[in-house]
């Protein structure tokens, strides 16, 4: 099973396929595994300080993490 990490600011858990997302503070996006981290897409906006890395699909007021 995927390692559960509390990476989001809002306290939501996200699967991270065994990667150390909580230790590094960065997010991994590997297939269906998504964690929170710095968003590399300027068009992505998330409230609450939660941002998604890579091809993030966050919108204002919503975070897929």
From Swiss-Prot:
GO MF: metal ion binding
Pfam assignment, any one: Metallothio_6
Keywords, sorted A to Z: Metal-binding, Metal-thiolate cluster
Keyword Ribosomal protein: no
InterPro entries: Metalthion_4_echinoid/annelid, Metalthion_4_echinoidea, Metalthion_dom_sf
Record keyword Metal-binding present: yes
Function: Metallothioneins have a high content of cysteine residues that bind various heavy metals.
Family: Belongs to the metallothionein superfamily. Type 4 family.
The protein's name in its UniProt record: Metallothionein
Record organism: Paracentrotus lividus
